[in-house]
């Protein structure tokens, strides 16, 4: 990525969105300027780094301080127009020179601690991902030369509070934020970043020994599983709209049993072979309902009424009025069939089940008896 491409906006829904930079870039820049300040013994107010994607960032330095062989500096996180929980916070680095020739890196206040396997970092270590670790150590080594040593501490005073608005606790990262970023650049509305964060939860649960997983579109699905089905939320992972991607990730990681649970408004699309359920990709909810109602012998009047509906909930009212609620079991079976078709080239595909529920938390249908599915998920 060139500097010009960094300055160029990302267009989304007709709006120009500004790119930003990651906590990893902030920590790298803060560590570099702290190392330079302790060597030169004077304050520096601007620093440049080259991100892993090749973009050069020129960043303002805040709170610079030198005390003997130690210096502290901070960089303010700017997520561009992809405002997240860490946007606007200060990421600090403290660099202390020594004569060991070695560089050490640790997390301080506000940087989370890894408590579970599965994210590529040792349990007990600071949540500073591999790419930022490399860039932080590299810029400090370049600054101090081959003979000197340095102890680096990355800290973020607001980190513990900000982390409560992130997925960190679910990923087993406690006490603060993560220092992350494989490219160093934040791209607004980045689907790949979102998908990767969801997949990471699958990896952590698999590393903990989980072989069965419930995939839900969002918070409503998770609540339903916990409150109405009595299934431990430890087996629940959000898939958002990325149904196909998350199923493939679960297969890659070796899960043996996948259960899809959600409202028909999302899951119906899977019955039509649509594995990315965002409306900007595809809809076909009413068409799918009409087709399967017709297969079940529904009268033309019901088909017409459903076809004219704008929402799944409205269609469901007509389906209930005509006594065709058994369509949900039929659709759940169709969903599982579609999943197995998608995985037809997989050597050992997992078992797949599907359950649909209404907005008022009533179970509408499933591909096989609910009791069997729940019992297996509790094993």
UniProtKB/Swiss-Prot annotation:
One of its GO terms (biological process) is anaerobic cobalamin biosynthetic process. Pathway: Cofactor biosynthesis; adenosylcobalamin biosynthesis; cob(II)yrinate a,c-diamide from sirohydrochlorin (anaerobic route): step 6/10. It comes from the Bacteria. Its EC number is 2.1.1.195. The keyword Metal-binding does not apply. Gene3D superfamilies: CbiD-like. Belongs to the CbiD family. PANTHER family: COBALT-PRECORRIN-5B C(1)-METHYLTRANSFERASE (PTHR35863:SF1). This is Cobalt-precorrin-5B C(1)-methyltransferase. The lineage of its organism: Bacteria, Pseudomonadati, Pseudomonadota, Gammaproteobacteria, Enterobacterales.
